[in-house]
């Protein structure tokens, strides 16, 4: 084997290892996951399946990966709620969609809405969910304070009709408005 061939093989081997290591560091390692069935809420005509959200453990926190369709375009408030229910309940004499889920999950008693990485906010505050013009949502969001699937089992995920400013001002709970879609995390 001549010197040029040997040098070319050595360079090729080094490049292959470098590319493999770079690929390894730029991906989120996959861990255990839960698939949550999500339904659009309709207390009068019954809920309708709109897809799933897969919750996966990663080195950076829990990753919520939606595979949803049939939703209204735009940013939507996306949260973990305290109860494992998507049932309607009565509020002020009116049947309200998804009220059985309770409020935003707040096991540490923060009593305020905020960013997903903010220590003094509800633990159930997630990044807003983006729904494209065709009604689909597939972009994952990261919840860095949530580390294990057992942290969220026995609760529900909720998608609100409006966006989320991650604050209680000017409207409480990010201003997301009514509950639009929900899934129980089992």
From Swiss-Prot:
Keywords: Antioxidant, Copper, Disulfide bond, Metal-binding, Oxidoreductase, Periplasm, Signal, Zinc. Residues 1-22 form the signal peptide. GO terms for cellular component: periplasmic space. Zn(2+) binds at residues 104, 113, 122, 125. Its EC number is 1.15.1.1. The keyword Metal-binding applies. Cu cation binds at residues 79, 81, 104, 160. Binds 1 copper ion per subunit. Binds 1 zinc ion per subunit. SUPFAM superfamilies: Cu,Zn superoxide dismutase-like (SSF49329). It is found in: Periplasm. Its main location: periplasm. Disulfide bonds join 86-182. Homodimer. This is Superoxide dismutase [Cu-Zn]. It comes from Neisseria meningitidis serogroup A / serotype 4A (strain DSM 15465 / Z2491).
